[in-house]
Design a protein with these regions (language model features):
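Conserved ABC transporter NBD signature motif
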Residues: 60-74
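Catalytic Walker B motif of ABC-type/P-loop ATPase nucleotide-binding domains
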Residues: 171-174
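ABC ATPase "signature
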Residues: 230-231
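A short, proline-enriched helix->beta-strand linker immediately N-terminal to the Walker B motif
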Residues: 165-169
Length: 254
């Protein structure tokens, strides 16, 4: 692995009086799979939203592939120009827990829209890219379907295909199975496993403890807006920290 694909330094985020992210620093290397675990309200999703610039940080630095997206100046968090942010956006994709597909678009249109509007590629190239992804994810026969005609697992696979269509360097997953019935969870986890085998760099917020243990190079435990512990799966699952052990044990026994 070479260099850091993602670098976060001293990230801070508040909503009103509530300090949600408290001085978090995190780096992710090429090909690394990092899972983020922790109780609800610990700041996991906000961390992802700030890292992907859906939310603006109140302090800290953010860079992708050595390219600065935000930095601190005179005590304030300053973002690079809109044009630079748009270019940096091409480095990453985000898969939401509630799919976020356009309901009035077909599966194919959902996938080709961003490559054409964001990356500026031709419709022909976008469709070729989409067809390849649909075949890879077992959805070729659903290309003309609309989201309401799909199961939750199929919708989430389409949202993964949509994120991959921009050919990102990093994929973020925000609890990708939390909106799915248990029997549909496996088909989405299978896709993420396949991406890990292809050395896709991924940051995954998840409550699937066994999955995180099997797949991750590193696991981060967050609580109350801070990283309480990070390390290999074995280090986390055999943690000397009683709170980490309690959380993992409780979630795995649900």
């Amino acid at each position: 692995m070479s260099g850091n694909f993602l670098e976060i330094k001293n990230m801070k985020k508040t909503f009103g009086e509530l300090e949600v992210i408290k001085d978090i620093s995190l780096s992710v290397k090429e090909g690394e799979v990092v899972s983020v675990i922790g109780p609800s309200g610990s700041g996991k999703s906000t961390l992802l939203r700030c890292a992907t610039m859906l939310e603006k940080m109140d302090g800290g630095e953010l860079s992708y592939l050595g390219e600065r997206a935000a930095y601190e100046e005179n005590g304030k968090c300053v973002y690079v120009s809109k044009a630079d942010r748009k270019r940096i956006h091409k480095y990453f994709g985000l898969v939401f827990q509630n799919f976020n597909l356009f309901p009035h678009y077909s599966v194919l249109k959902n996938i080709i829209d961003a490559p054409m509007t964001v990356a500026g590629i031709s419709r022909k190239e976008a469709e070729e890219r989409a067809e390849k992804l649909l075949a890879q994810l077992g959805l070729s026969e659903k290309r003309a379907a609309y989201p309401y005609q799909l199961s939750g697992g199929q919708q989430q696979r389409v949202s993964i295909a949509r994120a991959l269509a921009l050919q990102p360097k990093i994929l973020f997953f925000d609890e990708p199975t939390s909106a799915l019935d248990p029997e549909l969870t496996g088909e989405v986890l299978k896709v993420i496993r396949q991406l890990a085998q292809e050395h896709m760099t991924m940051i995954i917020v998840t409550h699937e403890m066994q999955f995180a243990r099997e797949l991750s190079d590193r696991i981060i435990f967050m609580e109350q807006g801070v990283i309480c512990q990070e390390g290999t799966p074995e280090e986390l699952f055999n943690s000397p920290n009683a709170r980490v052990r309690e959380f993992i044990g409780r979630v795995m026994n649900v």
